[in-house]
Amino acid sequence: YIPYLINPGLMWLTGINCAVFVVAAIQTFSAFYSAIFIYRIFREVIGVSRTDATLLTFFFFGFGYVMLSAMAPDHFIISMMLLLFALYVSGKLIKSRKKLTIWQSVVYFFITAGTSLNNGLKIYLSELFVNGWRILRPKFLFLAILLPAALTWGAARMSYRYIVWPREKAAKEA
């Protein structure tokens, strides 16, 4: 929604529709940080040499679907960046034998599930590996899993009711 709000401002300044440039900036940012996070996973979490980490990063981005998603205006590259970030942080926590806190879990879920809802499930799987079966304790289950899922569902319903539905209704009436 924020890029949508940036575009009218850029249109007012430049006189042209800058949506393509806004999307390109988001895609480039996401692809760049995906490369940074995958390199750090190879280097700091797995522990391979700098040369091997660099080669593996290039190899990863050599896959056709990764290259295509870095260029096509879709949410996949954004999801990949966020999930690689979560994988990096989870790997660092596992290596240092630390646990993921409730607030970290909530932030992870909101950011990743805000891009695509199935990413939230991947975050829960990550929490299972980092925290073990501790995620099934009532406090963690309610505050870190059920409450964020319910708030995300409520936000989705509100955005549909107050943003999408009025626009659809106005388009049908016109």
What are these regions (language model features)?
Residues 38-62:
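Transmembrane-helix signature of polytopic, membrane-embedded enzymes
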Residues 43-51, 95-100, 129-140:
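Membrane-interface helix-boundary motifs at transmembrane edges
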Residues 99-132, 143-148:
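Membrane-interface alpha helices of multi-pass inner-membrane proteins
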Residues 71-77:
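Short acidic/glycine- and proline-prone juxtamembrane loop motifs at membrane-interface regions
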Residues 1-21, 173-174:
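Lumenal/periplasmic acceptor-binding loop at the mouth of the active site in multi-pass
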Residues 145-174:
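Aromatic-rich transmembrane-lumenal/periplasmic boundary elements in polytopic membrane proteins
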Residues 78-95:
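Specific aromatic-rich, kink-prone transmembrane helix
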Residues 2-3, 7, 23-37, 79-82:
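Transmembrane alpha-helices of multi-pass, membrane-embedded glycan-processing enzymes
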